[in-house]
UniProtKB/Swiss-Prot annotation:
Protein family membership: Belongs to the nucleoside phosphorylase PpnP family.
Signal peptide residue numbers: none
Gene3D superfamilies: Jelly Rolls
Species: Shewanella baltica (strain OS195)
Gene name as annotated: ppnP
The enzyme's E.C. designation: 2.4.2.1, 2.4.2.2
Keyword Chloroplast (UniProt): no
Function, as annotated: Catalyzes the phosphorolysis of diverse nucleosides, yielding D-ribose 1-phosphate and the respective free bases. Can use uridine, adenosine, guanosine, cytidine, thymidine, inosine and xanthosine as substrates. Also catalyzes the reverse reactions.
GO molecular function: guanosine phosphorylase activity; purine-nucleoside phosphorylase activity; thymidine phosphorylase activity; uridine phosphorylase activity
Protein name per its UniProtKB record: Pyrimidine/purine nucleoside phosphorylase
């Protein structure tokens, strides 16, 4: 979906990697949460504390999923799922955006 309705949005951004990755938390009436983020070109490693679905909103990412050795490409409109308590890497050569839904 390209529009989120009836939500509350955190004014303060979540800033990572010296400002190269930034996101905002979005809270829904049912108690669920998503983050909307922008990633500058680079390579980054993230860890999860709960399950996540990462949807690519614009651009593309190469992703090294947990327990794999091959980078996989995800472009606009695609998504990948992550378990809780894992680490994964992403890299991109141009600005890209994502929406993270928490499971």
């Amino acid at each position: 979906m390209s529009l989120l309705e009836q939500v509350s949005v955190s004014k303060k951004a979540n800033i990572y990697f010296d400002g190269k990755v930034a996101s905002r938390s979005v809270f829904f009436a049912d108690g669920s949460k998503q983050t909307l983020g922008v990633v500058q070109p680079g390579e980054y490693e993230f860890s999860t504390s709960q399950g996540e679905i990462m949807e690519v909103i614009s651009g593309r990412f190469e992703v090294l999923l947990p327990e794999t050795t091959t980078w996989q490409e995800f472009s606009e409109g695609t998504q990948f799922e992550l378990a809780a308590n894992v680490s994964f890497k992403i890299r991109n050569t141009a600005i890209a955006e994502y929406c993270c839904s928490y499971l």
